[in-house]
Amino acid sequence: MLSQEDNELLTRVGPGTPMGTLMRRFWMPVLLSKEIAEPDCPPVRVRLLGEPLIAFRDTNGRVGVVDEHCPHRRSSLFFGRNEECGIRCIYHGWKFDVNGNCLDMPSEPADSNYKTKVRLTAYPTHEAAGVIFAYMGPPELQGEPPRFEWRGLPAQQQYASRWIQDCNYAQCVEGEIDSAHVSFLHSLVNKRDDNKAALAGAYFAGDRAPKWKVVDTDYGMVLGARRRTEEGRYYWRMNQWYFPFYTMIAPVPGEARSFRMWVPSDNTHCSIICVSYRMDQPVSAAEVNAWQKGLNSHAAVVPGTLRPVANSGNDYLIDREMQRTESYSGIVGVRAQDAAMVESAGPIVDRSLEHLGTSDTAVIRMRRLLLRAARDLQQGIEPKAATNGGLYAVRSHSTVIDEDGDFDTYPDIMAAMRV
């Protein structure tokens, strides 16, 4: 249960809100490089923390993330001409570079210096491993981008996709870090599945009430969930939550790692970027094919859009016969299953009506950390992780141990999570 006041604080991310101000201290994932793949390609609309923006790649390959609306008469630059190192408004020809400088005002007298007095809101950008980030906070507080494990990987070793969910970012993240639901939502019916890649393997099916151990860190928290195995051993799954909305779920042995970014478009929509990768070899064509079909880590989208094929408008393509005989949910794909649960709670869930239990330990802790960080910032206390990219050089991990001990008491487990 969360009070209405705290729920508002947690979920409102627009300009001037405490949570929006906190998030603007961090580098924000905006879109994928392949969405603006070529110099002078058409601009792309993006919405970030309630701000309507466009992203474009100029003639020299530089990326701009700028206000969608021309400062002249506020017409949309989405319709603009991306040419000769700038985006030109087609209304009166005003042209701006990736830094927001006005390069040309052909509708003004030739001897006018007015263009030196007008700027377009523009945000610094950073591009890494196929993802474009923007920094929207105070310039003097801009820190280094986060050093995620996958940041320097070549293209053949990673695959990235983006899609939109129709709800607030917080409930998206809560659905991701909740390990207890795996034993139900992603499970099979009347069938034993030892293929843990389906998230319904013996460890999850055998112990459906995991023991939680959450460890706070400077970057966020490690979320440990322990399950008993049939052999009398203990399966620990350590997932990561990083400020302010990043997650990494521990992969099953042999599977690629996946890292997700739950970026608030506004109060009621979330842009999700998922990067799946392998550190030591290229991802396979079969893996990419499965990801594109939305079978596990990624969502299948309607071609030419960011809208998932399985969505609220078609009840996530639920198959009641499959639900009766094969799948606990009747919905195909982990992403679609999760989306059905978090979106069906409403655009912004009323958390004052919840009844939380021990299985919600990670959810409760994440809310407290975000609320505390937002309130601290209002008192002038800056978030540590915002300027220290090295804090993000950690990964998720899973293992089986013989003793019933907490994961953080084992040096080898803690070492395995460091990049």
Predicted regions and their residues:
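Rieske [2Fe-2S] iron-sulfur-binding domain
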Residues: 1, 31-159, 211, 222, ...
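Short, functionally important structural connectors and interaction interfaces within domains
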Residues: 14-15, 22, 69, 74, ...
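A boundary/linker detector
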Residues: 1-24, 31
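Alpha-helical interaction segments
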Residues: 16-17, 81, 86, 306
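C-terminal catalytic domain of Rieske-type non-heme iron oxygenases
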Residues: 15, 37-38, 62, 133, ...
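A short, structural micro-pattern
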Residues: 24, 119, 126-128, 256, ...
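Short, charge-rich amphipathic segments
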Residues: 4, 18-22, 102-114, 294-309
